[in-house]
């Protein structure tokens, strides 16, 4: 389904939060949306791997990596796992790696920056907790909408019917 965050802002500005423009798009899909699942972890992706093994249909994984860009939280293997399990997208407040492979995986990915260094693989962190970055507080089960223009957040799903005809 087509979405346009600029159009959604024009229609729903009083009902949404707009994330500060600090993210770049890296995955094979430039637009994605869904109900968020949150993870808070630091330079460690073991818990991320566990969550991505779940059915992700209609879901977006939102990772609060503390804004650290010294180690990548998402690589091609994790992105492929997410795509294989139906995840709509991944947003990383941190770094990713293996950009050439990520571009060919059918999943939306937004992150702060790339770096070639991988992360630890211990399952340390928290899931389904509120996280705050980009000027917005994200709660589990909020709805997120992302495209090349930006990222917006809503407590309730937005009506996307009019975009079906575009």
Swiss-Prot record:
It is found in: Cytoplasm. The keyword Cytoplasm applies. SUPFAM superfamilies: RraA-like (SSF89562). GO terms for biological process: regulation of RNA metabolic process. GO terms for molecular function: endoribonuclease inhibitor activity; enzyme binding. Keywords: Cytoplasm. Its main location: cytoplasm. One of its GO terms (cellular component) is cytoplasm. It comes from the Bacteria. Homotrimer. Binds to both RNA-binding sites in the C-terminal region of Rne and to RhlB. Belongs to the RraA family. Globally modulates RNA abundance by binding to RNase E (Rne) and regulating its endonucleolytic activity. Can modulate Rne action in a substrate-dependent manner by altering the composition of the degradosome. Modulates RNA-binding and helicase activities of the degradosome. HAMAP family: RraA. This is Regulator of ribonuclease activity A.
């Amino acid at each position: 389904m087509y979405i346009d965050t600029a159009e959604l802002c024009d229609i729903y500005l009083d009902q949404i939060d707009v994330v500060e423009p600090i993210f770049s798009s890296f995955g094979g899909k430039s637009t994605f949306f869904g109900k968020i699942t949150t993870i808070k972890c630091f330079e460690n992706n073991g818990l991320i791997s566990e969550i991505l093994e779940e059915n992700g249909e209609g879901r977006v994984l939102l990772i609060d990596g503390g804004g650290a860009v010294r180690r990548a939280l998402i690589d091609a293997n994790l992105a492929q796992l997410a795509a294989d399990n139906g995840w709509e997208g991944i947003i990383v407040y941190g770094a990713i790696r293996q950009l050439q492979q990520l571009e060919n995986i059918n999943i939306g990915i937004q992150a702060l920056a790339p770096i070639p260094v991988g992360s630890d693989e211990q399952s340390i962190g928290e899931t389904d907790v509120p996280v705050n970055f980009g000027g917005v507080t994200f709660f589990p089960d909020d709805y997120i909408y992302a495209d090349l223009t930006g990222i917006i957040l809503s407590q309730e799903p937005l009506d996307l019917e009019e975009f079906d005809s575009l």
